[in-house]
Amino acid sequence: PDFAQAHYNLGNTLKELGRLDEALASYTQAIALKPDYAKAHYNLGNTLKELERLDEALASHTQAIALKPDFAEAHTNLGITLQELGRLDEALASHTQAIALKPDYAEAHSNLGNTFKELGRFDDALASHTQAIALKPDLAQAHSNFGFTLHDLGKFEEAIQFFKKAIELNPNFATAHHNLSYTFLSYGMLKEGLNEYEWRWQTPKFNLQHRNFTYPMWDGKTTLKDKTVLLWCEQGIGDTMNWSSCLSIVTSRAKHIILECQKKLVPLLSRSFPNVEVKAENRSLDADRDDFDLHLPMGSLYKHFMDEIMENGMASSYLVPDPDRVKFWRERLNSLGNGPYIGISWKSSNMSVKRLPNYSSISQWSEILSIPDVTFINLQSKDFEDDLSKVREELGVTVHNFDDLDQW
């Protein structure tokens, strides 16, 4: 029981099996027995990162380096964690240090390329990925990372080839499949993209969100006419509302539909789909549930019903507002003056380094906000005060804000 290396090796095995909480316990025990065990601190950090406990991962990687300053692997994994935390300049320094310690370390060159990409330094990113592949041509991770950089540059055809090469080298490389799905979808190859999107559940981030039911996931083939199907939300509120466009199709196929969604959406979706039993998401009893025959995460709806959507068109106006609230807001907006009334939102409430390229600054809206005879309404949920003041001072335009408007 006091053999630190045995606990460490057990942790490695458990981590490989995806049993991350148990791996965590084994690494922790190894460290308790041997506090200066740098590799145990390092793999503890890697496991914490997979569990998205980033601050703790950072501490473990830092401790591994303190114990073993020439530990190149710890430096580059510290860099990965720093990048996840949005600390890109520090991440760059960590990857650079790893390469200084071990110049032929292909993985570190590839990780450096990822950080360059996030910084918008695409030429440097491509050079780093090229170097990684030159050092280790069979490194699937490097081909996948190269592909993702090309994707961000809009070079979809080239990106697809790099992802395919990564998958050829490692057919079960879930991250490459998942990244390929986004490129296929961006390139308009919907069927291929939706098929590859199913690999999301094998990636570390999504694997943590999967639900452990006794009953099976629908395979898209089994008839639903005598089945109760549980659909469950898996991502954000906007995603749930988007995927709800498929509910009328599923409802027409199944005996009964239970939809579990974010609590805030229950009134809206109950009103919009009266034939669906809408409930707030509750994962606490997953293993014991017996109120359905089959289940499906909502992100898989398009995969199974895309042919029908393409043939008949997308559902339109499928969300039904509360008529009393419609009347209330119509009167309130009319009191501001003439319309049209345009609600605007220019950034996510979940701004991260990875999401920054998808959003705009309020300054980029100047042409739109300068259009005459339009009344603009703020739909930004937080951190908007300075932006609205800037618009008022620089453009002389008031974007109206209602403090009592539920912005989600």
Which stretches of residues belong to each language-model region?
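Alpha-helical solenoid repeat scaffolds of the TPR/TPR-like class and their adjacent stem/linker regions
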Residues: 1-408
